[in-house]
Curated annotation (Swiss-Prot):
Chain segments carrying region Disordered: 1-20, 73-96, 270-353
N-acetylalanine, modified sites: A2
Acetylation among keywords: yes
Subunit structure: Interacts with NAT10. Binds tRNA.
Keywords on record: Acetylation, Disease variant, Intellectual disability, Phosphoprotein
Name of the protein: THUMP domain-containing protein 1
Polar residues: bias regions: 1-10, 273-282, 297-327
PANTHER family found in the cross-reference section: THUMP DOMAIN CONTAINING PROTEIN 1-RELATED, THUMP DOMAIN-CONTAINING PROTEIN 1
PROSITE patterns membership: THUMP
Known disease link: Neurodevelopmental disorder with speech delay and variable ocular anomalies: An autosomal recessive disorder characterized by global developmental delay, speech delay, moderate to severe intellectual deficiency, behavioral abnormalities such as angry outbursts, facial dysmorphism, and ophthalmological abnormalities. Brain imaging is usually normal, but abnormalities of the corpus callosum have been reported.
Cystine connections: none
GO molecular function annotation: RNA binding
Entry GO CC: nucleoplasm
Length: 353
């Protein structure tokens, strides 16, 4: 009954193809490239943020990842797939064998197209997800940042942050708890231990509560080993939680603060830059204090001089003690983790991520 509706007669006598045929053809072209075409549970890869130029970001990502991927794992090899015979004379008369061979050739060609790095739809603007096969994303990204940190050589213009994603699951609290119980074991289960922090970011998702996610993940880490402690200054491990739509991306990274929150634009900057910035801010602070002291001496009011210092410290970027009051009411290390997640989300927004 549906076949006549798909092809309708036009005034010129021709036939118009139904929409279903175009949809199937488009879907077939996507599947022909091999592998998933969008971010989904069960993938490993690298989440990359950029600034309004995703196509250029993908090009830079391929170039950078292939360069360091070949250095760590060697170049990709497809000789086995390319040298497979295209036909067999002895099996031409056997229909069943010919069918099996055709299916095998299709599978082989699909596997050949599954490259080491493949861009997929992330589900968010200014975010690119590169699916990886046969490598460990956290080691590769750490190797890239370590080299850029040492050489101070800038290799990208569009890429902002590059976060390895070791696992993905559904972005529902129960699914995340179940997945994290086994995912976090290699780093935090006894006898393994370490200091940690949790960095949380959510995009295009409104059904997951930040404080609940951080509280549950922190509880899992402490349950795996009671000696795991929170350190927001220089943690040994940073648990990265990136939620996009209905997919939760997880990873555990090292040197998160040393490598400037895995920001490729910041990690190549000389250490002199922040010190100079702090010195400039300090000079401004001293100038303000001097002017305040002079005004206080003229007005003979000593109380105003004591109130000037907290205002300047807030201008230098320190957090206010009264922020996030709901999280502060909760005990233990969880309020610290929640405040860290707040700082992490703000920094991500500043990076156009």
């Amino acid at each position: 009954m549906a076949a006549p509706a798909q092809q309708t007669t036009q005034p010129g006598g021709g036939k118009r193809k139904g929409k279903a045929q175009y949809v199937l053809a488009k879907r077939a072209r996507r599947c022909d490239a091999g592998g998933p075409r969008q971010l989904e549970p069960g993938l490993q890869g690298i989440l990359i943020t950029c600034n309004m130029n995703e196509r250029k970001c993908v090009e830079e990502a391929y170039s950078l990842l292939n360069e360091y991927g070949d250095d760590m794992y060697g170049p990709e090899k497809f000789t086995d797939k390319d040298q497979q015979p295209s036909g067999s004379e002895g099996e031409d008369d056997d229909a069943e064998a010919a069918l099996k061979k055709e299916v095998g050739d299709i599978k082989a060609s699909t596997e050949m197209r599954l490259r080491r790095f493949q861009s997929v739809e992330s589900g968010a603007n200014n975010v690119v997800f590169i699916r990886t096969l046969g490598i460990e994303p956290e080691k590769l990204v750490h190797h890239i940042l370590q080299d850029m940190y040492k050489t101070k050589k800038k290799k990208t213009r569009v890429i902002l942050r590059m976060l390895p994603i070791s696992g993905t699951c559904k972005a529902f609290l129960e699914d995340m708890k179940k997945y994290a119980e086994t995912f976090l074991e290699p780093w935090f289960k006894a006898p393994n231990k370490g200091t940690f922090q949790i960095v949380y970011k959510s995009r295009n998702n409104s059904h997951v509560n930040r404080e609940e996610v951080i509280r549950e993940l922190a509880g899992i880490v402490c349950t795996l080993n009671s000696e795991n402690k929170v350190d927001l200054t220089n943690p040994q491990y940073t648990v990265v939680v990136e939620i996009i739509k209905a997919v939760c991306c997880l990873s555990v990274v090292k040197d998160y603060m040393l490598f400037r929150k895995y920001n490729l634009q910041e990690v190549v900057k000389s250490p002199k830059d922040p010190s100079q910035l702090n010195s400039k801010q300090g000079n401004g602070k001293e100038a303000k204090l001097e002017s305040a002291d002079k005004s206080d001496q003229n007005n003979t009011a000593e109380g105003k001089n004591n109130q000037q210092v907290p205002e300047n410290t807030e201008e230098l970027g320190q957090t206010k003690p009264t922020s996030n009051p709901q999280v502060v009411n909760e005990g233990g290390a969880k309020p610290e983790l929640a405040s860290q997640a707040t700082e992490g989300s703000k920094s991500n927004e500043n990076d156009f991520s």
